[in-house]
Amino acid sequence: MSENRITQLVKQDKKFLIAYYMPEFPVTGSTLPVLEALEESGVDIIELGMPYSDPIGDGPVIQDAAHTAIRNGVTIKYLLELVRRARQGEGCKKITAPILLMGYCNPLIAYGGDCFLHDALEAGVDGLLIPDLPPEEAADFLEKAKGFGLTVVFLVSPVTPPERIELIDSLSTDFSYCLAVNGTTGTAKLSDTATESAVDDYLKRVRQHARKKFVVGFGIKDKAQVEHMWNFADGAVVGSALLQYIAASATPEETARLAAEFWKTLR
């Protein structure tokens, strides 16, 4: 089995930038054009949301995007077919960037865990982030994901104690994901001086206890914040700001144009 794209990327001596996108948002047919636009605009990893009706870790922007995606017909099966088409270059240029899926346990259980891992690999997925899967209870899932060559990412928060940072670091396949602040996605106010200082101290603490790379997300909105986070972390994730920028799009073409326009401001 060949090494997956995420593993290949994290071996490089570079800081990386991850885009979070909710499929078929804001209009049906947007996904493949947006993936092409992001890749051509220099994205390093594409994180695709698996829409869920009760996304406990997501703020209003991503919740609204998830509800839109569900209304537009996005299921896990539909999403995996979009990934397959992206990898094959059907409906867009062939997408080669690593693809990470982010979603919650219940839909995966309903789909069938083993079937999901098999189908995700076959479609061209590289990794998985399941926010409500506790690392302490993930041994079976981790073993199976490893068997399929899929990267698994676990979350660290500002209140995670040092010994648990070390556990999460050891269990995350290639990198862990640090929540910049406690709360939900898109609600962080990283421009606040006190918040920024607290985040810096927290990321320094993670660096002391992590042997692998880690990325940081929640509330990152612009190039200045991306570059600031790169001082402490190996990667930055931008999601809610991207979704807000494209939210008023009326066509897939406009969505892709705006996605590219926004992403280029981060580089």
UniProtKB/Swiss-Prot annotation:
Disulfide bonding pattern of the chain: none
One Pfam family of this chain: Trp_syntA
EC code(s) of this entry: 4.2.1.20
A GO cellular component annotation in the UniProt record: cytosol
Pathway: Amino-acid biosynthesis; L-tryptophan biosynthesis; L-tryptophan from chorismate: step 5/5
Catalytic activity of the protein: (1S,2R)-1-C-(indol-3-yl)glycerol 3-phosphate + L-serine = D-glyceraldehyde 3-phosphate + L-tryptophan + H2O
Key words of the record: Amino-acid biosynthesis, Aromatic amino acid biosynthesis, Lyase, Tryptophan biosynthesis
Keyword Cytoplasm: no
Top-level class of the enzyme under EC nomenclature: lyase
Subunit structure: Tetramer of two alpha and two beta chains.
Name of the protein in question: Tryptophan synthase alpha chain
Native species: Pelodictyon phaeoclathratiforme (strain DSM 5477 / BU-1)
